[in-house]
Regions:
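Bacterial Sec-dependent N-terminal signal peptides
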Residues: 1-26
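...with weaker cross-activation on analogous glycine-rich loops/strands in unrelated enzymes
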Residues: 66-134
């Protein structure tokens, strides 16, 4: 019975993610893996001043990533054309998110916010790590994000890239 349940769980996980996402999860760049390891080490802890940007700043600088030191965190990717991976960085600008749980509608606003993709749960559905939020304060916390719930604003996703050794 136990083997059957394990087999059933594996099948569910395989078929609940799009094929490209399953393949992508196996091909995570080394830099992204290191960023996720760092994020895991700081969950429920305050990073620097506790600003959302500080988490990405520390992760990118710690592993010598190439970025502009402001809001361009690597290579801009298009989630419609290429898979989003754990360790990718999301920049929100003037974003409004609206979603419903049972009979309650929730609305969230993000004037300027930075987060790191912690897990990919499905196409454009992620668990993100971020701080300076209502739910976790200035400590790093995890929450879910579904890009289909974004009704306004600009969401950019960046793939961290290593600095070239020139």
């Amino acid at each position: 019975m136990r083997k059957y349940m394990v087999y059933r769980t594996i099948l569910f996980l395989i078929f609940s993610l799009p094929v490209t996402q399953v393949i992508a999860q196996e091909n995570i760049p080394e830099l992204n893996k290191r960023i996720i390891e760092y994020v895991e080490s700081v969950i429920d802890k305050k990073v620097d001043r506790g600003e959302c940007w500080d988490l990405a700043y520390q992760a990118l600088n710690r592993f010598n990533a190439q970025w502009d030191g402001k809001f361009q965190y690597g290579k801009l990717i298009n989630p419609k054309r290429e898979p989003v991976l754990p360790g990718d960085i999301i920049q929100f600008k003037n974003v409004k998110i609206r979603y419903q749980i049972t009979y309650t509608t929730y609305t969230e606003f993000m004037k300027q916010h930075t987060a790191i993709v912690y897990k990919v749960k499905g196409k454009n559905v992620f668990t993100i790590a971020h701080q300076n939020t209502e739910f976790s304060g200035r400590k790093v916390g995890l929450s879910d994000l579904n890009l289909a719930h974004v009704v306004k604003g600009d969401v950019k996703i960046y793939r961290p890239i290593p600095k070239s050794n020139k």
